[in-house]
Amino acid sequence: MDNKKKDKDKSDDRMARPSGRSGHSTRGTGSSSSGVLMVGPNFRVGKKIGCGNFGELRLGKNLYTNEYVAIKLEPMKSRAPQLHLEYRFYKQLGSGDGIPQVYYFGPCGKYNAMVLELLGPSLEDLFDLCDRTFSLKTVLMIAIQLISRMEYVHSKNLIYRDVKPENFLIGRPGNKAQQVIHIIDFGLAKEYIDPETKKHIPYREHKSLTGTARYMSINTHLGKEQSRRDDLEALGHMFMYFLRGSLPWQGLKADTLKERYQKIGDTKRATPIEVLCENFPEEMATYLRYVRRLDFFEKPDYDYLRKLFTDLFDRKGYMFDYEYDWIGKQLPTPVGAVQQDPALSSNREAHQHRDKIQQSKNQSADHRAAWDSQQANPHHLRAHLAADRHGGSVQVVSSTNGELNTDDPTAGRSNAPITAPTEVEVMDETKCCCFFKRRKRKTIQRHK
């Protein structure tokens, strides 16, 4: 099998967005007299399109508007309930470009349910579709957007702590935001500004590993408390993953998961930035050097980082036209495959984004203005609660409930702790959370 695919053990399905009335309801819903499962007054529950430790993801439909939505169902008796926390974080984020809309949260029979906007494929799915390499133009269009996306999250006093390609989705094909890169899954997010004191959280060590090992920062491997710098470093690792097709620390074997994560961290530290970014524009190395030198408390200069890539983009003569590498390819969706027509890219959106780029270029490199908090729109509900819910220096905290994805072929995620020596060969550093079922690959078979 092709080497590019060797280290890719992923499973799980997922993601979401809906339409209709927004709300947080305590009114119980469930099966109607016709036997149709309903969430709230107007969302009909359909087929299963994803699963994980949180429960299930279902395709839904707003019966008032006939628009498709995604519905996350979590058993009320869940050992580690987290759906209400995710809802609260979405509310805290409010309205912003590339932030999924949440339309409803409340009980549904024996489940808690959250209705979200239905989105398109994840960057990991699109990476597969493009033979596991993105062009420089596509990576730069992604990077420019995701720096802004992370700046917005940070402006809401949250750090994300879960960077991975599966957590960044394009809009649903045919939607006006179809080419916008969205950020999803705030199950590992945390408030870095104490809501009581309004001060930055203190620097601490001996913390549990939180996030996805393939992309997490070097300081996270060292057990240091995460802050804004770590989100940006993880993004840098993901950008190089897209350009290279793989990272030097993928596919490492060990007798235990703890040893494997130690090896990943050791290899990251031992890989010079110049080697990691060899044969690619110097701006990629400059980005990583900058974010790795940030102080724990320091506010990153997002404008400087964006300008690095927008200037490179201009020098290459690229147009920010949303002509990604996957344009023209057939995109899978939970409601049928869709041909991605280049003509669907909105000229108006392209002009708007170019205007934003020009605006960014005109700002000085040392400008450190925060994202305008006035963008929040009260009718867009999103949310999650900031809480460092997972302890233990040997635990790698993964999406939604702090457990590891060991490429479970049935549920997509596993409850195995990091200390468990079983299935090391099929353990993946990533946690899949795209909105539709992905083809499962077993690392054991690939490494034979």
Curated annotation (Swiss-Prot):
Tissue: Expressed in testis, brain, heart, kidney, lung, liver and muscle.
Positions annotated to bind ATP: 49-57, 72
Record: active site: 162
Span of domain Protein kinase: 43-313
Subunit structure: Monomer.
Family to which the UniProt record says this protein belongs: Belongs to the protein kinase superfamily. CK1 Ser/Thr protein kinase family. Casein kinase I subfamily.
Name the record gives this protein: Casein kinase I isoform gamma-3
Species for this entry: Rattus norvegicus (Rat)
Origin organism lineage: Eukaryota, Metazoa, Chordata, Craniata, Vertebrata
Gene that encodes the chain: Csnk1g3
